[in-house]
A protein has these predicted regions:
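Residues within the helices of the helix-turn-helix
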Residues: 32, 81, 108
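Short hydrophobic/aromatic patch on the recognition helix
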Residues: 45, 94-95, 99
Length: 114
């Protein structure tokens, strides 16, 4: 029974993390922000999320940012610099490096293709 209670609590924390992520990914990409909000350590958050979803908490954050970045590149007339700032990157270069590292192509190439 104790294990079942722990599983319920773990699922609740993971659900809370995802809810926080939906509301905050544009401004907060650091794991510590989310773990602090949930009153747990970053390591424990990572363990719970990975155990429950087979994807790390960091990957969840990264995916939300990339999905939004792709949507903005496809459907808006905003410049890459404007999108970078909207997603709280220091500048276009930082966003472009992040985007290329995750997707394999630059934001401008993504925009041209899609």
């Amino acid at each position: 029974m104790h294990s079942e209670d722990e599983n319920i609590e773990s699922r609740g924390i993971v659900q809370d993390f995802i809810a926080l992520l939906k509301d905050n990914y544009r401004k907060h990409r650091d794991l510590t922000f989310y773990s602090d909000k949930l009153s747990i350590t970053p390591k424990y958050l990572t363990t719970l999320v990975k155990g429950s979803t087979s994807k790390s908490a960091h990957k969840w954050i990264e995916d939300y940012v990339i999905i939004e970045g792709k949507a903005l590149l496809r459907s808006s007339n905003k410049t890459i610099e404007q999108i970078s700032l909207e997603l709280s990157f220091n500048n276009q270069d930082v966003f472009s490096k992040f985007f290329k590292r995750v997707t394999g192509i630059s934001p401008s190439e993504y925009r041209r293709r899609f």
